[in-house]
Swiss-Prot record:
InterPro entries for this protein: FluC
Pfam families per the UniProt record, alphabetical: CRCB (PF02537)
GO MF assignments: fluoride channel activity; metal ion binding
Subcellular location: Cell inner membrane
Gene designation: fluC2
Organism classification: Bacteria, Pseudomonadati, Pseudomonadota, Alphaproteobacteria, Hyphomicrobiales
Keywords associated with the record: Cell inner membrane, Cell membrane, Ion channel, Ion transport, Membrane, Metal-binding, Sodium, Transmembrane, Transmembrane helix, Transport
GO terms for cellular component: plasma membrane
Protein name, as recorded: Fluoride-specific ion channel FluC 2
Length: 129
């Protein structure tokens, strides 16, 4: 890890976090239901993009931190954009509000939809490749 890698991850993380905040606010203005739609959409779209770009960039698990493109985009932007911890917090909040069934549905739907979105992104990149 070099100081330049750290800089790219920090810059990318800031951009991704701002994107998550902006999209979350927009979704929150229009969706007022119990289901945490903003976090769900952010995580699913992020999974799609990381699946797509990982194939497009030819990134394997062991080398995803190595280059400016990988560090800045995959780890930085998409790491800042997606939010596993907010998904967990949303589920805990739903459970504390007596909506345990919705919390379980949210977690299962998030994981399965995220896996499908990442797979779909990877397949699209392979088709274009």
């Amino acid at each position: 890890m070099t100081p330049l890698d750290v800089m790219w991850v920090c810059l990318g993380g800031g951009v991704g976090s701002l994107g998550r905040w902006w999209i979350g606010r927009i979704v929150g203005e229009y969706h007022h239901g119990a289901f945490p739609l903003g976090t769900f959409l952010i995580n699913i779209s992020g999974a799609f993009v990381i699946g797509y770009l990982s194939v497009l960039f030819g990134v394997d698990w062991h080398d995803r931190y190595g280059t400016m493109l990988n560090a800045g985009v995959l780890t930085g932007i998409l790491g800042g954009y997606t939010t596993f911890s907010s998904m967990q917090l949303d589920a805990v909040k739903l459970s504390h509000k007596g909506q345990g069934g919705l919390a379980v549905f949210y977690l299962v739907a998030s994981v399965l939809s995220g896996l499908f979105a990442a797979w779909l992104g990877a397949m699209l990149a392979h088709l274009q490749g």
